[in-house]
Structure formats: C-alpha cells, structure tokens
Amino acid sequence: MPHIVLTNVSDFNSFYNKFKKEVLIIKNEKDQTNTIIRFEEIFSNQLKNIILIKTIVIENTNQPQTYYIMAMKKNNQITIRLDPLTDPKNKTDAVKISLANIAKQYKKIDPAISIGKTNLEQYLL
C-alpha cells in the first residue's frame, strides 16, 4: 500500500486549519493527455489525530476515482496513506501523486518536517 511517513512534526493540525480546496492539472505533452487531481474536503476526528482528505482523480477521460487520503498522527510522526475503506482499485500514478502532494503541503507549512519511510520516493522529487 502506498504510504509516506513524515517525521519531526510539531503541529499536526496546521494542515487542517490551512486546507484549501485545490485542483491539480497535470499535462502530458507526449501522450497529449491530462490528469486532474481534486482535493475537495477535509475532515478531522474528535481526538484530532486523524485527518481525511476527500480526493477525486480523473486520468485520460477514464472513470473518476474517489477516495480519501488519511493522515494519522502518532507521537511526532504523520503517516499519509489511502483510507482502507475507500482504497481505489487502481493505484495509478495520479493516486500516488495525490499522496505525495499532501506530504509536500505539510512540508511547505513546516519546513522542519522530514520524509521518513516511504514507497513513493519518485513522486516526492
């Protein structure tokens, strides 16, 4: 399962508080195709240790995939992964890019955050 672990996290909820709806459009000139990644809504649990981000991905005019990205806080770490209940069947490049984008947004908010364990290195560059 694709995941990213962020370490040295001091303020988990800053992302929740600063979240804005966003649409990423990735153009592939070679194939002349577009990929759309849309971050729609964000939810937090009562304990404020889990955040869910509703995400929609459309690739090459295929059926859209709707799923939630889960960010879980444990100690000074955050694990970013796909929510198991809405896990998309096709873990395409766009799905993996959406996870990496959330990690990049956390790093933008807090530059002291480091990337720990991940199987998405190529999407974090």
Give the residues covered by each predicted segment:
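Ser/Thr-rich, low-complexity intrinsically disordered terminal regions
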Residues: P2-T7, F12-Q77, R81-L125
